[in-house]
């Protein structure tokens, strides 16, 4: 997934957006460091999709209620043989990030890191040096 042997030229961190409370969502402001690297609309669509997926994960519904009841009735041993709704959505997020890296970010010399690896505090985007720029040195 990472561009082969390209040195890291920097990292960009997309911070959490607490304007709507403590739910997990990230700022969609386009970082200047990504200018001429990736389309602004594509970046915003990626962040919007991630925000929607995290909202889906945190949504309380019948399934979450049932999981909680089953957990109490089984002294939480139910989770040894079944995934929670939250875990299922986290897997969906990891798959989405992997697809975005393969199709959009890696070809541009970028790498999205799953926010779960950073404690859901930031979306980390690693910027790799352009081969054209680094070969001229």
From Swiss-Prot:
The keyword Disulfide bond does not apply. Disulfide bonds: none annotated. It is a lipid-anchor. Keywords: Golgi apparatus, Lipoprotein, Membrane, Palmitate. One of its GO terms (cellular component) is palmitoyltransferase complex. GO terms for biological process: Golgi to plasma membrane protein transport; peptidyl-L-cysteine S-palmitoylation; protein stabilization; protein targeting to membrane. The lineage of its organism: Eukaryota, Metazoa, Chordata, Craniata, Vertebrata. Interacts with ZDHHC9. Belongs to the ERF4 family. The gene is GOLGA7. May be involved in protein transport from Golgi to cell surface. The ZDHHC9-GOLGA7 complex is a palmitoyltransferase specific for HRAS and NRAS. This is Golgin subfamily A member 7. It holds the Pfam family Erf4. Its main location: Golgi. It is found in: Golgi apparatus membrane. A lipid is attached at residues 69, 72 (S-palmitoyl cysteine).
């Amino acid at each position: 997934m990472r561009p082969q042997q390209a040195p890291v030229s920097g990292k960009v961190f997309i911070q959490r957006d607490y304007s709507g409370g403590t739910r997990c969502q990230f700022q969609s402001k386009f970082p200047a460091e990504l200018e001429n690297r990736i389309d602004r609309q594509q970046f915003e669509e990626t962040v919007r999709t991630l925000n929607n997926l995290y909202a889906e994960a945190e949504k309380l519904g019948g399934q979450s209620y049932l999981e909680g009841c089953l957990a109490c009735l089984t002294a939480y041993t139910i989770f040894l043989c079944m995934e929670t709704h939250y875990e299922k959505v986290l897997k969906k997020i990891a798959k989405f990030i992997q697809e975005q890296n393969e199709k959009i970010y890696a070809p541009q010399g970028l790498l999205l890191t799953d926010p779960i690896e950073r404690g859901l505090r930031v979306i980390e985007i690693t910027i790799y040096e352009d081969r054209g720029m680094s070969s001229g040195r």
